[in-house]
């Protein structure tokens, strides 16, 4: 979306959901996480790499699950094709604040709550519950 201000078209490799939605970019962000982990995170470099890689990879997958746009350039720079998942339950978000504050925007927010945020919160809750002691849920003999 920022590219629009610089005259980069939506469908361009550097346009919306282009190179920044590729596995190559996810790997690059993993490497960035590896590099900055000792400076900003209490975790190891491996944790920094994993967080960077998974954050971008999950974003690619979620954008491929939307019902609009041109798809994601998941295999850029090797393949310029834009891809969608076969199953696309997430409503595509309108551009701009005015669009987000409309009836359609509310529908999008409810769709994202259902398909993105609720599952994320469930995973976080499970990690917090089981994280410190994975055996907690198993009764002792």
Question: Can you describe what each PLM-predicted range is?
Answer:
Residues 1-141:
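N-terminal membrane-targeting hydrophobic helices
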């Amino acid at each position: 979306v920022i590219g629009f201000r610089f005259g980069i078209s939506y469908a361009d490799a550097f346009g919306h959901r282009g190179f920044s939605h590729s596995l190559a970019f996810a790997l690059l962000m993993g490497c960035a996480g590896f590099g900055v982990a000792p400076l900003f995170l209490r975790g190891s470099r491996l944790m920094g790499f994993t967080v960077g890689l998974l954050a971008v990879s999950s974003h690619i997958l979620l954008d491929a699950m939307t019902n609009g746009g041109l798809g994601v350039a998941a295999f850029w720079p090797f393949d310029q094709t834009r891809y969608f998942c076969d199953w696309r339950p997430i409503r595509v978000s309108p551009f701009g604040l005015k669009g987000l504050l409309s009836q359609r925007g509310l529908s999008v927010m409810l769709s994202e709550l259902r398909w993105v945020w609720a599952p994320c919160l469930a995973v976080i809750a499970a990690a917090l519950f089981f994280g410190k002691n994975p055996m907690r849920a198993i009764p002792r003999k």
